[in-house]
């Protein structure tokens, strides 16, 4: 029976799994040109019971009105079946069936998200030899099919304690993995990268202020490590993956914006990994808030669920231009005319 996606996101997979524990290392030659990840910020914690893994998503955008629309859609739980996770392909099929296929009904429209395998980046003209395993991208041609998130399948490779401690060492498999994931982020111009190895889902958000910052060794990286096996109170893979897709969408949503003046102040730039507008005050200081905001008066953004754009408000009212139209911060993300 179909149930709201919100209900399925809170449920762990219940199909039995035989996990072999076989390992695949990674040591790709092309990845050696990229710096390992050295500045990790962990956002998952182990509970007092020593078993429950909790996740804090404050480093991502909070759920908004369009999220309510998505998770209210109905979807079906996976069919009952048995699993044996032995190869990377087994891990990928499990993830598609038990996680991705549950999450994607929420993203069938507003906006439409397309999942593809082993494909080149569609939003760039550069030629690359390497293919990432998974791309989740905006499907509408109006949006240049920008990638929301990209991902890799591995096999029993992620050492969760090292990643959560923010210290994956200076050599070995974890360092090689970090080089590879940074490399894919650079090649696909996507700061949101995940890796699933059959046991853990590793989510990485490169906090790159500009696209070029992806390459920098001092670029901070938000990190979540969610286990496949968790207690009922712990974070589910489905919920974590939904939030990750939503964060990738907020980035694409924000980067569609321009420099429309807001009461005389136009955004100075956009934070690349989040899409948030950055202002510059009269002293040259960069700030996330409008330079004229005070404790009593504030300019802020609201989401238009009809077309997916952000528009500006002032003290609870719509901010209008001289023609009486909404002052928009970003472009529409759905509701385009049929081709």
Regions found by a protein language model. Give the residues of each.
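Active-site metal-binding core of divalent-cation-utilizing nuclease and nuclease-like domains
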Residues: 112-148
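Charged, often low-complexity linker/regulatory segments
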Residues: 1-123, 247-339
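Conserved catalytic cores of phosphodiester-cleaving nucleases, focusing on short active-site segments
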Residues: 95, 99-103, 134-136, 145-164
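Short acidic, glycine/proline-enriched helix-loop-strand junctions
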Residues: 160, 202-250, 259-263
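Nucleic-acid nuclease catalytic cores
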Residues: 169-217
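Short amphipathic alpha-helical interaction elements and helix-loop-helix interfaces
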Residues: 105, 109, 113, 140-143, ...
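Short amphipathic alpha-helical molecular recognition features
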Residues: 83, 87-91, 95, 126, ...
